[in-house]
Amino acid sequence: MRKTLIPAIGLSLMAAALQVHAAGLSSEHGVFDKLADGTAVEKYTLRNSQGMQATVITYGATLQSLLVPDKHGKAEDVVLGFDDLDGYQKGTAFFGATIGRFGNRLADGKFSLDGKSYQVPLNDKTNALHGGPKGFDKQIWKAEEVKDKGSVGVKLTYVSVDGEMGFPGTLKTEVTYSLNDKNELRIQYHATTDKPTVLNLTNHSYFNLAGAGNGDILDQVAVVHASRYTPVNEKLIPTGELAAVAGTPMDFLKPVAFGKRIREDNTQLKFAEPTQGGY
């Protein structure tokens, strides 16, 4: 029996409306870098008529760059990334990567499914983090350009065989990045498995709306439309509780600067920053 899962993430960034007509939607691809064995890592660049530009590479189905113009028309790269493959291969921060099979941490690298216990490799002290030491972020994905009437995009595909990193089932995963003229970058996931498995896909981009390298984000303001969050323990493992954000540093229901929340006195902040857990 095949099982299909289709989550999606939408990202909308407001930028200056430059005087360029709708025909400005375009895409191109080339070589980003090469592996030691000579395998090419491709890059796909998506552009719209507003001056926004997203670059995705096939290593880890990674969002490598996202140029967004400000109200004066000056474009800044608002996500953190590397200019060559070496940084992604040696790095441990998962910059911009597609995370799988299982995002976040599995305590002791263990889980049970349908009465059977599974052990996956540890890569975060006593935890398995973001799919293990060779998760989706370390794989070369196949890519193809996709276009429709209102957007331009790239679809990346990876097949994880049964038992890879200890996870059951052969899993075919597709990640599609698309950009439209409303300055919306959309990430859509589609996965099919041939037997029951666990799956928690996400994108691991780090944002600085002032532009990469332009200071910290403590004065930047965020809104998260969620009334509950998932507390974690000292090992950053979710406790299973769905706690109310009201009265905690995790409350971003109304616009608030990150710096204000980070400086609050709360037990959760002894373990991680306010947005380390889930909402």
Provide a role label for each language-model segment.
Residues 23-52, 58-279:
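An exposed, glycine/acidic-rich loop-and-rim segment of catalytic or binding clefts
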Residues 8-19:
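Bacterial N-terminal signal peptides
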Residues 1-8:
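Bacterial N-terminal signal peptides that target proteins for export
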Residues 3, 20-22:
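Positively charged, low-complexity intrinsically disordered regions
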